[in-house]
Amino acid sequence: PITDLTIKDNSLIVATQGRSLWMIDDLTVLHQLPNSNKDPYLFKPKPTYRLRGNGGKNSLTMGTNKPNGVEVHFYIPSYEKGSDTVELSFHDEKGNEIKKFSTSDDDNKLEVKDGGNVFVWDYKYPGAEKFEGMVMWSASLNGAKAVPGTYQVKLSVNNFESQNSFEILKSPTSESSVDQMREQFNFVNQINKTISNAHQSIKKIRKIKLKLNEFLTNFSDNSDAENIIKKANFLVDSLSTVENALYQTKNESRQDPLNFPIKLTNKLGHIANLVTINDFPPTDQDKRLMMELSEKINKEIEVFNKLMTSDVSEFNLSFKKLQLDYLIN
């Protein structure tokens, strides 16, 4: 049975006979109820503490934790899947977009129903680029967590738009200062930018190698293409060298890194994984290792870019001069 009720920070707190305290709900939604329910409505999120861990439910005999993130309540009078587009975007204090979720986006999907809706933003900025079949060992490609401060949320329903500001607060249990959190934020963003550049290069490398291998299969017995076949083999080998330096291409399952050593982007992602265990800034050793790995990654990307501007371009010119049929019967 419920033995007591009180309000704390605009949340309803309930005490039960089992000596438990429960935070039932956010009462600010009731304080902001609109006069009409004909139009979409975006409620102003209440100030949210940036906490560690995540909300969840472990078993049927345990209570459900409050979601770890900014709870955004919004109202949609009616939603027709396929014809209506609903978007929820988060912005910094200057209005720069951080992340957008949409009913039409498969990656950042926004689930919507008629009536009241709630979405929880986990404070995170976009993470590093990924590619199909990628296997990493103890690495984080997650986005950096927003630093305590003022932010904006925007709701778009077809031609309707509304926005509100909200506050992310420093957790009273955190021993880090906001400046230290900001230093970690910038550090993780820098890591993710370097990893993204490398993984974008890997995607391009794999597309080029696919085309080159198709060429070698189709024209291996063409005596007129002997020189260009040598160029193709050289390109495949050179591109593979870059790819293998950036990423462990032998990995196919989650346990494969036990047998094959991790490569550059995995090592850099591992630093991000360690740094984000808490709210503290990176150590001097973290910074030095990050710079060392980033330099090695950038050198491999430079090699790839040179191959693109010289050898790949030369291959394309040679292919055109031979007037080879691209499509083989």
What residue ranges belong to the model's regions?
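Extended low-complexity, serine/threonine- and proline-enriched intrinsically disordered segments
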Residues: 85-102, 155
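Low-complexity, Pro/Ser/Thr- and charge-rich linker/hinge segments at domain boundaries
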Residues: 29-53, 165-197
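Contiguous beta-strand segments within globular domains
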Residues: 47-87, 91-92, 118-120, 181, ...
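Short acidic/polar inter-strand loop motif in beta-rich domains
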Residues: 127-131, 156-164
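Glycine-centered tight-turn motifs at strand-turn-strand junctions
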Residues: 97-142
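Mature extracytoplasmic or organellar-lumen-exposed domains after removal of signal/transit peptides
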Residues: 166, 199-329
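Beta-propeller blade termini and top-face loops
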Residues: 1-60, 67-69
